[in-house]
C-alpha cells in the first residue's frame, strides 16, 4: 500500500520538461487529454518559458519515494479566486498512484496554498 509520508510535491523545473513531455505524449495519457495533439519539444519549452514566472499558474512534479510519478497544474480561472487543476501520472505508475497524487495535490492546494475552490474537467471516457 502506498504511504502518504513518502509522497511530496516540488515545483516543475526546466530539467523535468523532457520527462513530463514523454508522459504527456504517451498514447495512454494523450488520449485522455482535452487537447490530444502530440506536443513538440520546442513547443513544450516555449510553453514553459511563457508560464514559469506567472503567479496565476503553478506547476508541480509529484514524487513518491523521491522518484517522479506525475505532473500537476493549478491555473487561476480569470475574474475569479478559483483555480482549475489538471494532472496525470506517468504511464507505468504503480496502481493507486493517481489517487495518492490527488490526495497530496488537493491537500497542498487547500492547506498550503490557501486556495478556496479547485475545479477540474473530466472526460466521460476517462
Label every model-predicted segment:
Residues 119-126:
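Conserved beta-strand-loop-alpha-helix junction that forms the acyl-donor binding cleft
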Residues 112:
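C-terminal active-site-capping segments
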Residues 95-109:
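Conserved acetyl-CoA-binding loop-helix of GNAT-fold acetyltransferases
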Residues 37-93:
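Acetyl-CoA-dependent GNAT
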Residues 1-38:
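A short, well-structured alpha-helix characteristic of acyl/acetyltransferase catalytic modules
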Residues 19, 43-46, 100, 104:
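Alpha-helical elements of Rossmann-like donor-binding domains used by nucleotide-donor carbohydrate transfer enzymes
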Residues 116:
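Short acidic/polar active-site loop segments enriched in Thr and Asp
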Amino acid at each position: 500500500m502506498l504511504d502518504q509520508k513518502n509522497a511530496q510535491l516540488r515545483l516543475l523545473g526546466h530539467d523535468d520538461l523532457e520527462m513530463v513531455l514523454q508522459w504527456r505524449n504517451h498514447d495512454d495519457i494523450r488520449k485522455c487529454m482535452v487537447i490530444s495533439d502530440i506536443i513538440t519539444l520546442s513547443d513544450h519549452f516555449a510553453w514553459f518559458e511563457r508560464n514559469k514566472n506567472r503567479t496565476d499558474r503553478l506547476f508541480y512534479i509529484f514524487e513518491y519515494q523521491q522518484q517522479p510519478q506525475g505532473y500537476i497544474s493549478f491555473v487561476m480561472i480569470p475574474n475569479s479566486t478559483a483555480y482549475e487543476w489538471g494532472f496525470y501520472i506517468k504511464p507505468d505508475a504503480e496502481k493507486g498512484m493517481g489517487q495518492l497524487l490527488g490526495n497530496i495535490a488537493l491537500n497542498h492546494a487547500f492547506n498550503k496554498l490557501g486556495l478556496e475552490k479547485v475545479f477540474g474537467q473530466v472526460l466521460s471516457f476517462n
